[in-house]
Amino acid sequence: KLSNDKTKIIVKWSKIENKGIPSYKRFYGPQFLLQISGSGLVAPSGMFFNARYSKFHIGNFVDERFKDIFKSERYSRIMNYLASPNFDAQTMMGTLPIQHYVSEALDKHIKGIEKIQPAKDPTPLHKNFL
């Protein structure tokens, strides 16, 4: 057992059991959790940092402020594309990105499978998360 009183180790069995194939086709998560490379590149997900995915490069902190990147036409265009039927998260991206659980929850909410509810407890669920 790896967990103790200070650290809780949680195996993400759902990621293992689904063999890396997400249940969703549209990629909603990046709007809530962008990724930034060490060079300042802002992309919807780390898997898109490579130059061959330059059409997904939203901006770069070296050249512009986050506020300007966030309010840019590029940001809107890329986020709308990822959430559209033209993008298939099951075939057009890498295996289970950091935004996986956000995308999964939003997909279930939009489809009416499981609505997202406000938290009832004021204590954050992940106050010890690393």
Predicted feature residues:
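Short, acidic, Ser/Thr-enriched surface-loop or helix-capping motifs
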Residues: I36-S39
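Short, small/polar residue-rich loop motifs at catalytic or cofactor-binding pockets
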Residues: R26-P30
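Flexible mid-to-C-terminal extensions adjoining Fe-S/redox cofactors in radical SAM and related proteins
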Residues: M47-L130
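Short, compositionally biased leader-like segments
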Residues: K1-S14, K120-D121, L125-K127
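Aromatic-anchored helix/helix-loop segment that forms the rim or "lid"
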Residues: V11-K25
